[in-house]
């Protein structure tokens, strides 16, 4: 059996050989079914699935997105099981499947850390969830999580720079940012060394390559400049301004959730784990427990399914 997490931008699969992350945007012509079929052909016999990609704006509503994802999986794995927001597995498309990936992670981790909490920061969002009172988490939609502070909509790759930072000091002058989608969090985090080539899996804002120079050029456009106009130092200042704002936003949310719940341990997963674990005095899941932190929901749903066997 394999574990599958279908996001709006990335498809994450965990099998016996490890973690596999595929850039697979659901708002375009998606090769979702074709990618999953490769694992069937490689010998996988079934799949345990979670999703959050039903929210992609290529779908009319969540129901259409859920049906699309379930159909894509069942083309290869007709007996696949899907974890829902009710904390149960399902075999058919239903509303409970919407955005249940984080709940699967919590359901798995709380068994080892009953008074802990999770920060799972990936390409697009940060899930910040205390494990205490698990029953209160059942049925919590993304909207409710936003209201509770358990979902912070920023990630290591896909957040537009101008959504969190509005200015940087360049050549000694405060320089406001344009609000065009010129650069993203992937560019800022790449330039500062928080991620590398393997982690920067999302499409770039200009469709060009991932390299230090390309990222610096995209960052420079944030202040309506070519890289030659503000130099590398200017572009790095833009990256630093963004990452400072992003880190404050996430760390403040973690601190509040921890204090409110009285949590004693913060478990950090996702591609942002190496950056954020030290900032929140947390435990990086991969190094501490061997859990595949880059694809935590896919790993978690697989383990939950195995416990049922």
Which stretches of residues belong to each language-model region?
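Glycine-rich GHKL/ HATPase_c ATP-binding element in histidine kinases
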Residues: 126
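Glycine-rich, mobile lid/loop segments that gate access to catalytic sites or pores
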Residues: 122
């Amino acid at each position: 059996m394999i574990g599958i997490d279908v996001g709006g931008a990335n498809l994450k699969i965990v099998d016996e050989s490890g973690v596999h992350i595929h850039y697979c945007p659901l708002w375009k012509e998606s090769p979702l079914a074709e990618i999953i079929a490769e694992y069937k052909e490689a010998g996988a016999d079934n799949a345990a699935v979670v999703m959050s990609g039903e929210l992609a704006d290529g779908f009319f509503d969540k129901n259409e997105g859920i049906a699309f994802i379930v159909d894509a999986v069942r083309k290869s794995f007709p007996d696949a099981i899907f974890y829902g927001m009710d904390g149960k597995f399902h075999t058919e498309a239903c509303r409970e499947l919407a955005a249940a990936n984080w709940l699967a992670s919590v359901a798995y981790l709380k068994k080892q850390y009953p008074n802990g909490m999770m920060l799972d920061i990936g390409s697009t969002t940060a899930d910040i969830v205390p494990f205490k009172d698990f029953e209160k988490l059942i049925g919590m939609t993304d909207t409710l999580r936003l209201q509770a502070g358990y979902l912070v909509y920023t990630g290591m790759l896909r957040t537009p720079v101008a959504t969190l930072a509005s200015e940087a000091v360049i050549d000694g002058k405060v320089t406001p940012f344009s609000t065009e989608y010129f650069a993203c969090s992937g560019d800022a985090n790449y330039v500062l060394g928080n991620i590398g080539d393997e982690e920067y899996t999302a499409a770039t804002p200009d469709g060009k390559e991932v390299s230090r120079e390309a990222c610096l050029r995209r960052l420079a456009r944030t202040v309506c400049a070519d890289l030659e106009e503000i130099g590398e130092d200017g572009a790095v200042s833009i990256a630093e301004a963004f990452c400072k704002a992003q880190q404050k936003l996430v760390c403040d949310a973690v601190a509040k959730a921890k204090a409110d719940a009285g949590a004693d341990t913060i478990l950090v997963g996702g591609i942002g784990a190496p950056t954020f674990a030290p900032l929140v005095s947390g435990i990086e899941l991969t190094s501490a427990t061997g859990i595949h932190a880059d694809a935590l929901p896919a790993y978690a749903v697989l383990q939950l399914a195995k416990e049922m066997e």
